[in-house]
Amino acid sequence: AEFPSQVQYLLIGGGTASYAAMRAIKKRDVTAKILIISEDSYPPYMRPPLSKELWYSDDEEAAKKLQFKSWNGKWRDVYFEKPDYYCAPSDLPAKSEGGVAVANNTRVVSLNPTDNIATLKDGTEIKYDKCLIATGGQPKNLPVFRKASAEIQKKVSTYRTASDFTELNNITDGVKSITVIGGGFMGSELACALGHKGQKVGFEVNQIFPENGNMGNVLPEYLTKWTTSKVKSEGVNVITDTVVNNVTMQDGRLKLQLRTGQEILTDHVVVAVGLGIDTSLAESGGLETDERFGGYRVNAELQARSNIWVAGDASCFFDAKLGRRRVEHHDHAVVSGRLAGENMAGGQKSYYHQSMFWSDLGPDVGYEAIGIIDSALPTVGVFAKATEKDTPKAAEGAGLRDDGAENPAENTEKQPTTTTTTASSEEFGKGVVFYLRQQKVVGVLLWNVFGRMPIARKMIRDQQAYDDYTEVAKLFKIHSEELD
């Protein structure tokens, strides 16, 4: 591709944060010329459906086109814009009204912040006025698979991109067994999604992870147990408290030897054990990275140094309420991308709006959360019985989630946790869990309670300590039968 020698706005990375920044720049600077450099083969798209809705479609052809039915029944595709929204990079200089170009399948390999120059992998140099780094990261693999033979590696994949979805979707059409490694958000959502398809098509799904239950690092133990039983009910063989020690080939299949001595024969393995953050521009760009949280260190305005901002997964930012953080979630990519874009176009806003995140295990159980959600923190939970209206399906129908077209979790020091719950039943139909640090609420998790995020956001902003959480929970109206 031919590139302009100079661009006004250079956005490195083609994901949600980059897209949100582009929208924010265009809002403030109507004739902006913006170049997005993406390693992906597709124009910017949203990732959440890749582990959620795309798997629940009965229409195979639609899934191949990355189209899906929202939980509320409406059809759409994963792309933020139609293809003709973007122009070719070489056409950008001539766009007197402004324009947005995307260069796919390439990457920036070095930055020269003194002269404001970015160099692409083919040696092309592009001078920029303002630059955003929103490179996210690459999914981690495990040494046991990384060091395996080429024959084994053919049957092992990681999961992050639309291409990964297409590949895995094709694989699942011809296997008897598939195994997911990892018990966090991605691993658990994917296991449920594959379980759903497996029950229809006829393959078994295993899920293996070291924690004592699904989402064990984020949910209090009683919710972890409940979630694990929910995942099992989706047809998943959940194997907790263990890891894969060794992998060999047996009759064309993978034989996984677990630490517990158990052996599992499977046709394909998907590794979902988190993200390795891409900070490859740190050295050439003279950018500081964060040893504790990973990612590039930026200030509260998401700026790393003059003319360089960082948003999304790779941004380790300063949050005036909760301290230094790094967050890997869709809504954070939207919020931080938007903020960085506004500031690149002359704004002076600091990080204030707490991003939220959600995780749906199919259309019937889901949660939304905000702030610091970590099972090592003391928690207080208040629960009530759920009704039909308390599902992701109903929430989406009410239009309560920001898909990012317009408009996360992290670790803190491990410490003993105290869990109280005022749920009389083991059902945990719907409820709210408060995560505390020094007695103050730093995180709120809404379990099958939707549309109450503004209340939770205000609580974190206020940083108060409360005496009676049952009273506080009433603010979320978990006992009322219908949404107001």
Q: How should these model regions be labeled?
A:
Residues 1-12, 24, 81-179, 257-259, ...:
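FAD-binding core/adjacent interface of flavoenzyme oxidoreductases
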Residues 168, 466-484:
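Cysteine/selenocysteine-centered motifs that mediate thiol-based redox chemistry or coordinate metal-sulfur cofactors
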Residues 6-30, 186-198:
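N-terminal Rossmann-like FAD-binding beta1-loop-alpha1 element of flavoenzymes
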Residues 24-125, 219-237:
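N-terminal Rossmann-like dinucleotide/flavin-binding domain of flavoprotein oxidoreductases
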Residues 1-7, 314-452:
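Mid-to-C-terminal Rossmann-like scaffold of FAD/NAD(P)H-dependent oxidoreductases
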Residues 151-174, 255-256, 261-343:
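FAD-site-proximal beta/loop scaffold in flavoenzymes
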Residues 177, 185-248, 353-359, 366:
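Rossmann-like dinucleotide-binding cores of NAD(P)H-dependent redox enzymes
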Residues 15-19, 41, 137-139, 163, ...:
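Residue-level detector of alpha-helix initiation sites
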